[in-house]
A protein has these predicted regions:
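Mature extracytoplasmic enzyme cores
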Residues: 5-224
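N-terminal-proximal low-complexity accessory segments that begin disordered
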Residues: 1-3
Length: 225
């Protein structure tokens, strides 16, 4: 795009449009990005603040026959963060929160008798240029890079020549497992139960609580949006 989005030249052109619109008695609607959907700051958000962009829920799984000793490091990096660790016995679908078995970012668990699915529930960062709509700091940063830049330069036109702004399609845009780490803590605060006992329901049938667990997680996500 020329001139580059949000560059000095870009705003110079925008000011020309505003002056012409004012002289002709016309209105101008500000669109807050350069493409669909809104929330990328023209790609700058991903380049400059990747932790504030879209995140996905991922599950890493190991099947282990007990009794056995299982050890595995947790995901700890700028792009991947472990939110919960669980184990489900495949025959009974009994679920165990393995948080207490984590030491120094490593899971070390003595697996009981049976066949167990050991699951690490991770949040992967920076999977898409779009802002993480569910993280207030991320949204504030995106606003400061876009709306605030218009307001600093063209505030006198707002409420007059500029009487509308257009924000295009808040949503998940085909990434159904869009996530944010705050959901884990919010789940535990609201329901008083470890999220690790219910994350498996997002991937498996865990029994009678499956539907309720899914609704609980997705309700929280919808509220944050």
């Amino acid at each position: 795009m020329e001139p580059a989005y949000l560059s000095r030249e870009y705003f110079d052109r925008y000011e020309e449009m505003l002056r012409i619109s004012e002289r002709l008695g016309q209105k101008l609607i500000v669109y807050d990005d350069i493409d669909f959907p809104s929330g990328t700051a023209g790609g700058r958000l991903l380049r400059e603040y990747p932790r504030y962009t879209r995140k996905l829920l991922e599950m890493q799984e190991f099947e282990v026959c007990g009794p056995a000793r299982f050890e595995h490091p947790l995901a700890v990096s700028d792009t991947l963060r472990c939110m919960a660790v669980s184990a489900m016995e495949t025959a009974s679908r009994r679920i165990v929160d393995l948080g207490a078995a984590v030491r120094r970012d490593t899971l070390a668990w003595d697996v009981p008798d049976g066949v167990w699915k050991i699951m690490f529930f991770n949040c992967r960062y920076a999977v898409h240029p779009l802002v993480d709509y569910m993280e207030p700091e991320a949204v504030e940063r995106c606003i400061s890079m876009t709306y605030d830049e218009y307001a600093k330069r063209f505030g006198r036109y707002f409420g007059g020549v500029v009487n509308k702004v257009f924000f295009d399609d808040v949503g998940y845009v085909s990434m159904e497992r869009t996530w944010t780490p705050a959901i884990t803590g919010l789940f535990e605060s609201r329901y008083g139960r470890p999220a690790a006992l219910y994350y498996p329901a997002l991937f498996y049938d865990i029994g009678p609580e499956t539907a309720a667990a899914r609704v609980a997680f997705y309700d929280l996500r919808a509220e944050l949006m």
